[in-house]
């Protein structure tokens, strides 16, 4: 096997290989100390920063979800309250409508009763006025028939008798 590199025109120098191996190890040690350490620290910091951002984002997301849920609850309560207010307003409107109708009916009945009372009163006044006119005419006719003037007491008695007759005939 030692003949193979010579046939190809390659020669190996053990010292060069050893020196290059040693230089490579020193270079790797220096890279590890001066480049890899800070690079790993930067990567660790970046990893920590990203993890912190993810955690922060998750917390903000949880808080946002919590706020959304609170808003849903508040919206649901507001809808229920508005529905309750609408129902109460409808009930109040119906009650006021019924109260107004009832008051209008009562006022109508009161006006009817007042009109009936007024009619009865006017009828009584008309009957009374008619009786007085009839009495006056009766006295006038009677006085012409008798051809004498009745005194006031006799006239009153005659009127009362006539009114009794008229009242009985009704």
UniProtKB/Swiss-Prot annotation:
Subunit relationships: F-type ATPases have 2 components, F(1) - the catalytic core - and F(0) - the membrane proton channel. F(1) has five subunits: alpha(3), beta(3), gamma(1), delta(1), epsilon(1). F(0) has three main subunits: a(1), b(2) and c(10-14). The alpha and beta chains form an alternating ring which encloses part of the gamma chain. F(1) is attached to F(0) by a central stalk formed by the gamma and epsilon chains, while a peripheral stalk is formed by the delta and b chains.
Keywords annotated in UniProt: ATP synthesis, Cell membrane, CF(0), Hydrogen ion transport, Ion transport, Membrane, Transmembrane, Transmembrane helix, Transport
Membrane topology type: Single-pass membrane protein
Biological classification of the source: Bacteria, Bacillati, Bacillota, Bacilli, Bacillales
Transmembrane residue ranges: 20-42
The protein's name: ATP synthase subunit b
NCBIfam families assigned to the protein according to its UniProt record, in alphabetical order: ATP_synt_b
Name of the encoding gene: atpF
Annotated PANTHER family: ATP SYNTHASE SUBUNIT B, ATP SYNTHASE SUBUNIT B', CHLOROPLASTIC
